[in-house]
Amino acid sequence: MESREAGVERLYPKITGRMSARYYYLIQLRKQLERVIALYVRNSPHQLLADYGCGNKPYEPIVAPFVAQYLGIDLELNPIADIHIAPTGAIQLDAEKLDVVLSTQVLEHVVDPKQYLQEAHRVLKKDGLLILSTHGYWMFHPDPTDFWRWTSTGLRKIVEDEGFEVVYFKGIIGRAAMGLQLFQDGLLFKLPKFLRPLLAIIMQPQIIFFDKITAQ
């Protein structure tokens, strides 16, 4: 698991930093999360929110100020998780306890996305909110596993199949920019480590430019 310092860099990446290859994507991800918080969370400050698959809790700083309590849900091997996931996949929490479940870039890593979403639905109150982000296109990144990618319609379907109503749906970056991101990532690990940041410094501004002129 990454350190808390790495979590801060995930929120505010530097183009010359260790997450330079994901610079633009991480910025857009944070901005979309901030937008969703502003739309659906900020005006209801007494809510209980749990980060489902919290890792090192990178998004706690931008979520916690707007809820009554922020909790982390993760596997038992995560020492900073407040609530654990049993080996069966069940969240160790009673039904209908949470107002908001936050899931950022986790769904692609779980063995059984259906069960994962069922558990999110179970622990949410009847009018609860699931804030979910995952990948359409992305390079293979096991942590410790990496199983799934979705089209927009495929993602909507698996979420709706588990009883959720989709009220907001937004891509992070457009197809042209994503194509350049994948091109960069395809080259990245062919290069010596000392050259990889240089490739990111060259590619990330192009990804930003093409996303702005071809945004869908």
Question: What are the residue ranges of the model-derived segments?
Answer:
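Short N-terminal secondary-structure initiator segments
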Residues: 75-81, 123-124, 134-135
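Short catalytic micro-motifs in class I SAM-dependent methyltransferases
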Residues: 105-109
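Conserved N-terminal segment of class I S-adenosyl-L-methionine
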Residues: 1-96, 100-104, 117
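S-adenosyl-L-methionine-dependent methyltransferase catalytic module, highlighting the catalytic core
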Residues: 19, 111-119, 123, 129-216
